[in-house]
Design a protein with these regions (language model features):
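GST-like domain detector, emphasizing the conserved glutathione-binding G-site
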Residues: 1-121, 127
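Conserved beta-strand edge residues that scaffold enzyme active sites
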Residues: 32-35, 176, 194
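Short Asp/Glu-rich motifs
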Residues: 37-39, 181, 199
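GST-like fold's C-terminal all-alpha helical module
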Residues: 101-184, 188, 192
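Terminal-tail/helix-coil boundary detector
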Residues: 191-199
């Protein structure tokens, strides 16, 4: 399989972590999304022109949620909980992150560089952080469910982003945030992202 990723693409990193969880090896092709020629080249691999995209033989799967579902099938369900109810919750949480938290995306952009912590949080970010805290409080610890899965892969990148801007959650939510920050798959993903930057 070949995974088409973008430099500093959070969704590429989330899919990469899911691949590690599923014990699937990728050949990685890195796209520099700030380079117009390189970005135009994405359409060679992705019908949407977006990353990540997965190429498996003649099959092309685009969009991170679809890719994760494909990886989950290849790995006999390894990325989601065994319980049907928990699987539904896990998919809901992944979808919520996929489509939401726009204030954090716009005002706390993902970066591998050191950034200044936010001194104040506007109403939009405050509301989103409150929702994240509610989600994180549900964690069974050290993962969201009884084993590491797609939800942890998705929200670990968010935990990293929050921490970079000095947003540290409290109580059980804070315990889950710290657990994600300590998670070796997240740390490996950050190293991988830095390696992508040099390509």
């Amino acid at each position: 399989m070949e995974l088409i990723v973008g430099k500093e693409s959070t969704w590429s990193l989330r899919v990469w972590i899911c691949g590690q969880l599923a014990n699937i090896d990728f050949n990685i092709k890195v796209i520099d999304l700030t380079d117009s020629d390189d970005k135009a080249h994405v359409f060679t691999f992705s019908p949407s022109g977006l990353v990540p995209a997965l190429v498996d033989g003649s099959l092309v799967v685009h969009d991170s949620l679809a890719i994760v579902e494909y990886l989950n099938e290849q790995a006999n369900g390894a990325l989601f909980p065994d319980s049907v109810n928990e699987r539904a919750i896990a998919r809901s949480l992944c979808s919520e992150l996929h489509s939401g938290f726009m204030n954090l995306r716009e005002q706390c952009s993902f970066t591998l560089e050191n950034v200044m912590p936010l001194s104040t949080l506007n109403d939009g970010i405050t509301n989103e952080v409150s929702r994240i805290e509610t989600i994180f409080e549900q964690a069974q610890l050290p993962y969201m469910f009884d084993k590491a899965g797609a939800v942890d892969a998705f929200y670990s990148i968010l935990a990293y982003r929050l921490n970079a801007y000095g947003i540290v959650l409290n109580g059980r939510a804070g315990d889950y945030q710290q657990s994600l920050l300590d998670w070796h798959f997240l740390q490996d993903a950050i190293k991988e992202a830095k390696a992508w930057e040099s390509k």
